Amino acid sequence: VESVRLAVRQGEQDQILSKLTDSQTISLVRAFGHFFNLANVAEQVNRSKVLTDEKNATGSWLSRAVDNILAAQKISKDFDQKDLQTWIDNFSVRPVFTAHPTEAARRSVLGKMTTISELLQQPDSQTQTKRLAETIDLLWQTDELRLGRPEPLDEAVNSIYYLNELLQETVPEVLAEFASEVKRLGVDLSLSAKPLSFGTWIGGDRDGNPNITADVTRSAILLQNSHFTRTLLLHLDQLVQGVSISTKLTGVSKELEKSVLDDLEKLPEIESRYRRINAEEPYRLKVTAIRHKLLITQQRHADDSPHVPGRDYKDSAELLSDFEIMRKSLMANNGQLIATGLLERITRAIAAFGLSHAKMDIREHSDAHHYLLKQLFNDSSAEIINKELESTKVIDLTKLDEQANKCLKTFV
């Protein structure tokens, strides 16, 4: 790589490149690809260090923005506290994941690049150098190309890699900092607020892609839910270790006591050992029940079985309700630091991601919708649609052809 770079600068690249065999050319292209990827990782790590030093010296961009708002509030009457609360209540950022075959990267490669990034952030040492060399060697011997063109679910797995990383590390801390900073403005960010959420087109964007069917969309959503559950369980493992609060030493709310009893009754599969050793630790029992209900919810979606109240979660609101029960009990019983710490960070992350990990946008060309509506109602105008929505008559779906039926299956 270095020889070719030097030759290019000297205008002598043809002397090297013209003598390469096909195999050597492929190796050279791969080497340059890895070189640029590794250079990008090194630059990102260095940039991260610069930003961290800047944050430690002058505060984050968010804290500086809050400082500017506070300064403006002192000299301006254009907005008041009520305006600030309204703005924050309605504040919403929603990044959307998309996919393109040219941007697809194997998770094996992404994982190794992440390892290299983490190693570069460690102090220089012989161990660090050896592990960097080992990981780069593994990267070189890993085929960065899949055997075939990525299928929609392959692309979904690729985006989920980033969603998992965001849920596990970044988003809980970002939202905690956001809540802390806006509090300086006298604004409370409710735990159900969604200043940050995520969307995806992957598995739902069927506009011009015949491979995206209703089954593919459903599989992508199930995949997202299973990964959300898996990553959230890591947070719950941390939480269950932390909330070792004993009723011998502090009280708990009647609501929490009743909730735990209901959970234990409706979830008989919770091991008797957990019931016994955590008998005086209701928060641990509650988190254990949440864990079981999440796994049952995941299985319910996979099996397409009906919701069973008390055994699984109908939606994200029910999951958040369980966390709210714990929060209120902690706040009323000298557990404010715990309630506003790990528990709050997990709660805000759940509000951001929801059970589906990211909200899927279903995208389809309007012609497909009009085609379906014309087969159903012989018309696709807004007037006829409104009329049919108010009608109670049964619609005959057997007359739909394959094209119309494909569109219909997306929604029913």
Predicted regions and their residues:
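C-terminal amphipathic alpha-helical interaction region
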Residues: 395-412
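Often metal-dependent polyanion-binding catalytic scaffolds in large enzymes
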Residues: 1-390, 396, 400
